[in-house]
Amino acid sequence: MKQKETKTSQIALVDGEKLSITDSFASLFTLDEEEENDSVDNEEIKLTKEKHEKLLLLFWLHCKFPNGLEWLHSSSDLLPEQVSEWFNFYQKYRFKRGRNFNLSARESVTPIVEEPIVPEEPDNLEGVSEETPLKETSLELSEEEIITSKSPIPSPETIHKNIDVEEKETIEPTTPVKEVETTAHAEEEKGPLTPDSEYAARQLTEELANKSSQEEGVDKQLRVVEATEKEHEEDGNEENVTVTKPVEVATDQVESKEVKKKEVSETTEPTAPPVTVAEVLEIEDKVPKVDEVEEVHSPEAKVTENDVENVQSGIDIEKTIQLLNNQEIPSEQQIISVDKATESPVQEVAVDVNEKPVDEIVEPSKLQMENKLPSEKSPTIDRTGVEAPLFELSVSMPLTLIPPSKFSEPVKPELSSEAWLLRTEMSPLHLRLKNAHKYVLSDNWSHAYREEIVRQSLHHLTVAKEKGIWSFRQPKRQNEMPRLKTHRDYVLDEMQWMSIDFSQERKWKIILAHRMANWVMDYHQASDKCTVCTPASLSKNKKPYMQENEHQKDSHEETFNEQIVSHFNLNDNNNNKVLSIPRDSLQFYNAVFSDDIFVTTNSEQIQNCVLNVPMYGPPTENNEYCEEISEKYPITPVSRFAYAKTKLKSTCAKASRKRLFNQLELSPPESFMEKKARSDENQLDGNKIKDDNQKLSSVGTFSVRPPYPPSSKDIRPEAPWLPEEDELLLLLLRRYSFNWEFVASRLTPPGLYIPLAEKRTAWDCFERWIQVDPRAANVQLTGSHARLAQQKLDESLRHSDKVSQHLSLRDEGTPNHLIKHNSYFLLPTVSRHYRPITIFEAIRKILKKREFAKKPTMTKRAIAPSAASTEKLPPVPSPLELSRLKSEREAQIQQIQAQRNFAQLQSQNRALRPQNAAVAAGAQQHNQQLAAFQAVAASQNSSNNSSAGVSPIAGRMVPRLQPYAVSSSLKLTPEQIHQLQQRKQTVPTTERTQ
């Protein structure tokens, strides 16, 4: 009970509002004290105690930090003094409750007022954004400006008393409000600073904007004061004077705070909703600038301090809100808002005197500023009483981040006929089909054909629209003239009869022919020919003159009918029926409704078709018109199945991929009792299969065209056939009329790689059919290679052990788990359970053969070591001995090689001796000849010079020819030496000729 009372009392402390605190705040002020009762088993008591601690902590936080709890998020660490203060507060007030708790707890906590940290002023302030937030001081100054418009310029002391008005402080956390500044000419900051948090950034921008606006405001105020003083001196009228004078505001913040607290305790005023940027821009447009202020002189410019207080206290907030909603801002109202500066606080007081009464001027201006400009230290509350969000920042979002609405989504325009016509003319479909790199179906060409037809029709339509001859109302299609029936139409009518029951039609034709033969015999045997003859119909060859004697013809017909009745001796009961029938339909009645050909059926479909069939009979005399069915339907209905949609058996029911579907042979699943009864019948009737085989073998002979037999190279061992494969072979042969190639492809399992043992050929199927099918005993082979196939078949059957054995549809040796109902339709891919067994058996046989082949070689190898084991093995040499033997062997090899080289060199020298002698003799002879030649030439030159009286010229020095250096190793034959000598002799002769 105590815990519940504590909970209710704490909720009452916060004015009935529901408070909640996050775990982050609770973690900052953790309690390390010990519990009084450590062994607390009740969980509800624990929960209520924790709730009480959190509420108490929240109360202390609101009292300690009245400016808001956002300071806890922005601050890095808490001071130990604050934490210890909280511990003391908790120990003191955790058991107290009631009204005394509220007063004593509030007085015990000393609040901490946050002082904004103003950054240093940059050197150059340029271009601050125009949409800067308004300060709270602008609201306060606007109120003073309105007050001073009614009173003369008061002293600084009186202004200081009424300049700062603060609203009531609340326990709830304050919210930083978006502020807007009305100054039109703002400067931007030269270098943007980067604060640590968003709140600090907002404070920084506000302070910079305030400083720039204050400097501009002071300059404007000084200009206005100077201008007004000059005009006052010139005019000299003290009655009509408007003075704007800068007023200094006291900088003592302590006194102003005390005044604010007293005023807040007395009166509380509701706050207005936040001001948006658009509303501020409208205010700026409507409020004239300072340069455009018109000076209006009032007769009385002195107001006492009591009047100012009366005006301030006489403002009704509710009335002002109504006036603000109904009344716009006056166009001639002029308000100059100047923020309070930090270093040199100077404010401007604008005195606006108008011809209107003071109350009418004061109320709208003050109402607007109070309603539009909220305070900074209190949370903004809308007119509906809803509290504004914690942070209200003016951020210009880019257009890309705004989600598009459903109306802004681009709607894909429908393709018009003109656009489609243009596209098809630029790139028609039939040209693309001609150049297609893939196969093109007939459906694609039909689509291109239809596109061309539509394109041509649209083209004609556009041409008709251009000429003005096109109307949206199309004329009705004109019916064509019906045509007369031709022989083809009569044949089609007869085909309708034949389509109903062709076999009965054939019987009826035979009977009709038999009757006609009897009529001919009756004609020849009759004594009176007139009784059996019928007059020929002359309707087609009728002439105009015969129309006059039509009554004679009618009388002749009546007499003829009477003769027929008397000739056939009809009974009285039948006379009425026969005489009532016309002569033209008499033959039809006797032929169709005879007992021999009339067929009754229970099929409703056939009975309905008979009603639509035209009456059988010869063509009438009148020309019948044929109804053209092609006008209604795309094709001429030859039969009643022309417009029926053909359905394949595969589409009627979805058969399994590995099963052959047969709609007629499929039976419903059997129950357990039916299976048991069927198995008992098979056991009792063991000779049933043999009887069936005998019935099949009793069939007469029939011809079969065998496949071409394989060559001797293509013969391979026969693959095993399973009982299911035999059943499937017989089924496919009956279904596809002994198409051996197609049946072999169906029996071969699908896949890219098919082993040779599993691949079935046409000849394999033919051989297996001869062995399995009992009807193969009466078969007669036909075709060009029938004799060759018979020879191959005899050779293959001669080697087989079971030539005369005819397997049944199910072998007795087939395992029971493979005998299933409807296994007649199983494909070979389903029943491949025997393949691994056959492969393992083949591997086992091969391994046995290898084992038998290895046994004699193993005995021989075992005998050889036994004989060698009796002999003594030589001792194993050591490494030193092996190296010595190797060096001795290498020395012997080198010695033998040197002897061979020396003998070869001697033999070469002996062969070169006569050759060297011959070469030396030839060189000596050449030198002698050269010397003789030089001597003769010198003598000739000297004789010529002496005869001409010219001094002799010294002969030229001819270089001496050196013999060829022939190595001793060169071997020259005598013929080569002779050729060399001749070449040397020819050299001087050529020089002489030159």
Curated annotation (Swiss-Prot):
GO cellular component: NuA4 histone acetyltransferase complex; nucleus
Residue ranges of every copy of the HSA domain listed in the record: 475-548
InterPro entries in alphabetical order: Homeodomain-like_sf, HSA_dom, SANT/Myb
GO molecular function terms listed in the Swiss-Prot or TrEMBL record: chromatin binding; DNA binding
Cellular compartments annotated: Nucleus
SUPFAM superfamilies: Homeodomain-like
Keyword Transcription regulation: yes
Ranges of biased composition (kind: Basic and acidic residues): 158-171, 178-191, 204-233, 254-265, 288-305, 672-693
One Pfam family matching this protein: Myb_DNA-bind_6
Family per similarity comment: Belongs to the EAF1 family.
Protein role: Component of the NuA4 histone acetyltransferase complex which is involved in transcriptional activation of selected genes principally by acetylation of nucleosomal histone H4 and H2A. The NuA4 complex is also involved in DNA repair.
Name of the protein in question: Chromatin modification-related protein vid21
Species whose genome carries this gene: Schizosaccharomyces pombe (strain 972 / ATCC 24843) (Fission yeast)
Lineage: Eukaryota, Fungi, Dikarya, Ascomycota, Taphrinomycotina
The encoding gene: vid21
